[in-house]
């Protein structure tokens, strides 16, 4: 995979593998593998397909391997990264310091979410920022009340500054 100075490198995760007959010790004629691929900037679905085909060729399996994408109705998620000196980043950091008195570090997260669509597909600079809490992505997800209040003020100040 390609590398990125902050996001490091893409990842490969085998989500599902199926082949052969249950309970028998035979080499299956067909094996289907579902691979989830996290990419870094500069990689896309075409890059991933080529990397898999290159790996098959290196193993002498190019005639036995078929690579295809899982169909979807929306674009495949592409990676993005804002520079630490991007106006959105520095404005958010300034507002955070004004509200909390603390520095807001820039961190990079090797994951995908709706921000990928905003940043890549729509060209809207995007950061992920919010309160700490627990139960992430579950029915009991919560944010600490004092952080929710602080975040609301940070959002307000950031938007006000960006709209000047």
Set out the residue ranges of the language-model regions.
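Metal-dependent amide/peptide-bond hydrolase catalytic core
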Residues: 1-164
């Amino acid at each position: 995979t390609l590398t990125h100075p902050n996001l490091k490198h893409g990842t490969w995760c085998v989500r599902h593998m199926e082949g052969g007959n249950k309970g028998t010790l035979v080499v299956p004629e067909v094996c289907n593998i579902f691979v989830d691929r996290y990419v870094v900037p500069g990689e896309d679905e075409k890059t991933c397909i080529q990397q898999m085909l290159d790996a098959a060729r290196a193993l002498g399996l190019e005639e036995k391997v078929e690579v295809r994408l899982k169909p979807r109705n929306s674009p495949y998620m592409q990676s993005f990264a804002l520079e630490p000196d991007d106006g959105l980043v520095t404005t958010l950091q300034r507002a955070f310091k004004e509200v909390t008195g603390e520095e807001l570090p820039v961190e990079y997260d090797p994951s995908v979410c709706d921000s990928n669509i905003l940043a890549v597909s729509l060209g809207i600079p995007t950061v992920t920022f919010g309160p700490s809490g627990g139960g992430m992505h579950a029915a009991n997800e919560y944010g600490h009340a004092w952080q929710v209040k602080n975040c609301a003020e940070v959002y307000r100040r950031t938007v006000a500054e960006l709209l000047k």
